[in-house]
């Protein structure tokens, strides 16, 4: 469901990551914590200071221990934390969620695209529900796009699919709702 598959560059050390970021333009950083969760979040903050325009996602294995450690971390350097539950559709959902967040302002206020707001604070739950939600929305959009008369109209209908936004707190949900209340599904 991506117009073109993403290119992925894997690095094994923080030094390699910073070297790559200095050499090439990247649209997304996905980092996976090792044994020391704190180092991951410290490095994410350092990356965010240097590259504030690049979304940073932490992808963790699911365990109660990891969840407890994340609850104590400063998450200011990351845009999202997701729990890897073995569903590869999560990667597409992460990309789509970030695209939707970046495009929401123009697509919703100028074009009139609808918005689905998911309000959830459980990393494990939103990591499992978002791939299902996006699969449903994208399938419905594909069905709708088959009614188009030509390729251009088909692409416009696919791009006009409802946007999905994730709020992890009540305050965040209210802020999004107040901004886009006229376009909520």
Question: What are the residue ranges of the model-derived segments?
Answer:
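Conserved phosphotransfer microenvironments
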Residues: 5, 10-18, 22, 26-53, ...
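Two-component/phosphorelay signaling modules centered on CheY-like receiver
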Residues: 1-9, 124-165
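Active-site catalytic pocket residues across diverse enzymes, especially alpha/beta-hydrolases
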Residues: 47, 51, 98, 133, ...
């Amino acid at each position: 469901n991506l117009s073109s598959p993403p290119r992925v560059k894997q690095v094994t050390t923080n030094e390699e990551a910073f070297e790559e970021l200095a050499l090439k333009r990247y649209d997304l950083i996905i980092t996976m914590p090792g044994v020391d969760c704190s180092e991951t979040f410290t490095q994410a903050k350092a990356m965010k200071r240097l590259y504030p325009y690049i979304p940073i996602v932490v992808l963790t294995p699911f365990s109660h221990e990891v969840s407890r450690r994340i609850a104590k971390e400063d998450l200011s350097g990351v845009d999202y934390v997701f729990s890897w539950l073995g569903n590869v559709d999560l990667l597409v959902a992460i990309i789509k969620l970030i695209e939707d967040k970046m495009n929401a302002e123009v697509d919703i206020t100028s074009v009139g695209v609808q918005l689905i707001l998911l309000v959830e604070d459980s990393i494990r739950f939103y990591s499992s529900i978002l791939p299902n939600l996006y699969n449903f929305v994208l399938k419905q959009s594909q069905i709708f796009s088959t009614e188009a008369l030509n390729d251009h109209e088909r692409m416009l209908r696919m791009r006009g699919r409802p946007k999905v936004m994730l709020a992890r707190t009540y305050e965040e949900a209210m802020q999004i709702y107040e901004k886009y209340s006229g376009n909520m599904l």
